[in-house]
Design a protein with these regions (language model features):
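Extreme N-terminal signal-anchor transmembrane helix of membrane signaling/transducer proteins, especially
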Residues: 2-41
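Membrane-proximal extracytoplasmic alpha-helices
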Residues: 38-72, 81, 85, 89, ...
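Extracytoplasmic/periplasmic sensor domains and loops in membrane signaling proteins
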Residues: 80-87, 117-156
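Short N-terminal helix-loop-first-beta-strand/juxtamembrane motif that initiates sensory/input modules
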Residues: 91-111, 146-148
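Amphipathic coiled-coil signal-relay and dimerization helices
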Residues: 110-116, 161
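A short beta-strand signature within small-molecule sensing/ligand-binding domains used
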Residues: 135, 158-169
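Short hydrophobic/glycine-rich mini-motifs in sensory/regulatory modules
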Residues: 171-180
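Membrane-interface helix-start motif
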Residues: 185-197
């Protein structure tokens, strides 16, 4: 007798109450599988949304740099003034209660502007607590052109390392890599919340 026939015979021989329990168990397992799949789809959608958000913010920041570079090209400002004004503008643009901010490095991983790092600091050897070379990832992503990298970092004033989605773009004329990251710690919570609603 083949396995399918054996299962059919086993089910046929069960008392009606056990058949009902088996049916309810299978339905419950099916609902759980659907909920997990829905949560995963929701999670992936939220990640894509967050990636688009940070990419759009960096693109807007690149427009700011481009505007000041254009002023320098037209002679309205000298290049040093244009860079200072671009830095001041980008430093003032923060989101999510000042948690998400722009920073600028150069391709040699030296800080041009960062709210928590000294200008000129070499960051190529900087590692997150998880052992990730953060600035190497950022520089490689910007030079590849896709711009995305992921690492862990604490939120300002906290110690816990949280997942971060980061987008970087290289402004070649000035040799600047503009970067912004958003924390992704709430994405999984939102996705599971979707299944409870």
């Amino acid at each position: 007798m083949n396995p399918v026939s054996a299962v059919r015979q086993w089910v046929a021989d069960l008392p009606i109450t056990r058949k009902f329990i088996l049916l309810c168990t299978l339905l419950t397992l099916g609902i759980i599988v659907l909920a997990v799949c829905a949560a995963r789809m929701q999670y992936l959608g939220l990640v894509d949304g967050r990636k688009q958000q940070v990419k759009t913010q960096v693109e807007m920041g690149m427009d700011v740099i481009g505007r000041y570079a254009g002023m320098a090209r037209r002679g309205e400002l000298d290049e040093a003034q244009a860079k200072r004004q671009a830095i001041a503008m980008l430093a003032s643009l923060k989101t999510n209660g000042d948690v998400d901010y722009f920073f600028i490095t150069d391709p040699s991983m030296r800080v041009v502007m960062h709210p928590k790092r000294a200008t000129g600091s070499y960051m190529g050897d900087y590692k997150s607590d998880a052992g990730e070379y953060v600035y190497r990832q950022i520089t490689a992503a910007a030079q590849r052109g896709d711009g995305f990298s992921h690492y862990t970092a604490p939120k300002p004033g906290e110690k816990n390392q949280l997942p971060k989605i980061v987008y970087s773009s290289l402004y070649k004329d000035w040799g600047w890599i503009l970067t912004m990251g958003v924390y992704a710690d709430d994405i999984q919570r939102e996705a599971w919340g979707f299944t409870r609603d």
